[in-house]
Swiss-Prot record:
Transmembrane segments: 27-47, 93-113, 140-160, 201-221, 248-268, 315-335
Name of the protein this chain belongs to: Divinyl chlorophyll a/b light-harvesting protein PcbD
Principal location: membrane
Record flagged with keyword Kinase: no
SUPFAM superfamilies given in the database record: Photosystem II antenna protein-like
Organism for this UniProt entry: Prochlorococcus marinus (strain SARG / CCMP1375 / SS120)
């Protein structure tokens, strides 16, 4: 993390990232523990929503964000094709069990295992040490992340092809084969918000699966080849030396998640193919006052949650504002990674009483 030239810098308790910055074992512990928290939140919230679900009120008018996501991918339907929540409790309980497994793994890595995996006796584990200004180390780790995301995309494509997902045009679950038309995928970069074909949606995920797995394999191979053996010349400032750091990687992560949240907000607000009206409520209307926001357009006199708003309105607005603040975090950490010292700003403001001004005519 940025020290502004002070090698003995100390951090307050609130600067949690500083605890794991140069301790790869503890870094893994925080990741695994965070995964456990996400699983616990997903499982617990799903059970909470299921216990309060009222079949006489549209799902989108209730507190049903997790149920809506499950319904969209074809989970919770009986043999007659009606959504009854069958199997949902099982999925929620599995998430709760997994949260304990992940929590235990986080504790093991945080308390029992080595602080740094490079000290581990396991040869493969040593490869995941943290060297923030080493492009080989960072690209090797990036490659594994890309492969995991690619596998997740492939699983989703196969789930839609074999099990089927909910098609709002039919009002039923159907099997969806992906459309791997590359010209369509290219054009959908610009009009994806209006996409109305599940085949195109799955085609995009299939393409992402291929691109991410291929890219991940490339990065792993590239990371396993020392920089000096790649015939790329010296690892210089021009090529990123001394810019690649823990703070820089954090800023890029915040930029990615912030951008995805904002894109999801615009998509959720208006698209009824990926976010079916039956599960999320009616499409929203875009407004702008001090900042952008979206409002409901349907009759919500029967709404039971979100202060009288639909699940779509809650999901959209929360995603947008979380994305906005994630991007502010990106700018903050990116500037710090570039060497900008925010302390100079506060020092300048605090010294304004002693400042002298000269006006030249």
């Amino acid at each position: 993390m940025q020290t502004y030239g002070n090698p003995e810098v100390t951090y307050g308790w609130w600067a949690g990232n500083s605890v794991v910055t140069n301790r790869s074992g503890r870094f893994i512990a925080s990741h695994v523990g965070h995964t456990g928290l996400i699983c616990f939140a997903a499982g617990g919230s799903t059970l909470w929503e299921l216990a309060r679900y009222n079949p006489e009120i549209p799902m989108g008018h209730q507190s049903s964000l997790f149920l809506a996501h499950l319904a969209s991918i074809g989970i919770g339907f009986d043999e007659a094709g009606a959504w009854t929540g069958v199997g949902v409790a099982t999925i929620a309980i599995v998430h709760l069990i997994l949260s304990m497994v992940y929590g235990g793994g986080g504790l093991l890595h945080g308390i029992l295992f080595d602080e740094n995996v490079e000290d581990s006796e396991v040869l493969q584990a040593k490869k995941f040490k943290l060297e923030w200004n080493n492009p080989d180390n960072q690209t090797f780790i990036l490659g594994h992340h890309l492969i995991f995301m690619g596998v997740a995309c492939a699983w989703f494509v196969e789930w839609a092809r074999i099990h089927g997902i909910y098609d709002p045009a039919l009002g039923a679950i159907r099997q969806v084969n992906y459309n791997l038309d590359l010209s369509m995928i290219w054009q959908r970069q610009f009009d994806f918000i209006t996409i109305d074909s599940l085949e195109d949606v799955m085609g995009g995920h299939a393409f992402l699966a291929f691109a991410e797995i291929t890219g991940g394999a490339f990065h792993i191979v590239a990371g396993s080849t020392p920089w000096e053996d790649k015939k790329l010349g010296e690892w210089s400032k021009f090529k990123g030396s001394e810019l690649l750091s823990a703070e820089a990687v954090l800023s890029w992560s915040l930029a990615g998640i912030g951008w995805m949240a904002i894109v999801a907000a615009f998509w959720c607000a208006s698209n009824t193919t990926v976010y079916p009206e039956a599960w999320y409520g009616e499409p929203l209307q875009f407004k702008f006052a001090i900042s952008p926001y979206w409002v409901d357009t349907g009759d919500l006199s029967d709404a039971t949650a979100f202060w009288g708003h639909s699940a779509r309105a809650a999901l959209t607005n929360v995603h947008y504002y979380l994305g906005f603040f994630f991007l502010q975090g990106h700018f903050w950490h990116a500037l710090r990674a570039l060497g900008f010292n925010f302390k100079n700003v506060t020092a300048s403001i605090g010294n304004e009483q002693k400042a002298t001004f000269t006006i030249k005519s």
